[in-house]
Amino acid sequence: MVCIVSAYYKIPSKKPHEWYLPYLVRWFRAAASNTVPTHFFTTEDVRQELASLTDISRVQFHILPFEELTAAELGREFWELQYARDPERYHSPETGMVWYEKRHFVRRAIEMEPDINVFIWCDAGCIRNDACEEVAKKLGQRFVQYEAGRMYFQCIQEPAQKQFYQYPDECIAAGLFAGDRAAWKDFIALYEATLFEYTIAGFSATKEQNVMASCVFKKPNLFVLWTQEGKVDRTWFKFLELL
């Protein structure tokens, strides 16, 4: 069995909250037509706003204040440092915190779902058009031959063989990724260690795509890099129609 996990927080981000709302509505419309168990982490005000816009009844909500995220345990100064080192200035410290937290949202869902083996992270803002919305209705129902103990990443281009990645490197698309319980456990531990290696080396760890690429460099056998293109979305969100 498969589980979908996502989250959304109203924070300083690349785009204003109003820009994301239509895509959030699309996400929940697709979820309403899906049969895969789905967990969503957010705040109560966001839940109420979404409930006023679309049907959210099939999704299991978890109200988790932003200040209670695992990312907050690293301290505000840690995320301010990542932002200060980040050449892409539209990434706020809060954005870095949510990107980091994706793995811990999944960790929480894993703890809640002892009978489910495969977990898919799916960004709440990744459904941008009608075609993506349609294929997302079957997310988690197509691909069943997950290799035990391996994470599945969307590969934009084969990562160069190096320890650290920074702008303009683009190797891994982080809107959707998946794996079984064992793979997630190993990936979370590897990501944590790699995050601090970035910090010690003087690189920004804000952008999860870069840290994920470094994880692939360090432990390639943990990952399946999916290069196949989608028909609806060819790159960043192709797992919407492939998983």
Predicted segments with their positions:
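N-proximal low-complexity "stem/linker" segments adjacent to membrane-targeting elements
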Residues: 1-23
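Active-site-proximal specificity loops/subdomain of glycosyltransferases
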Residues: 55-113
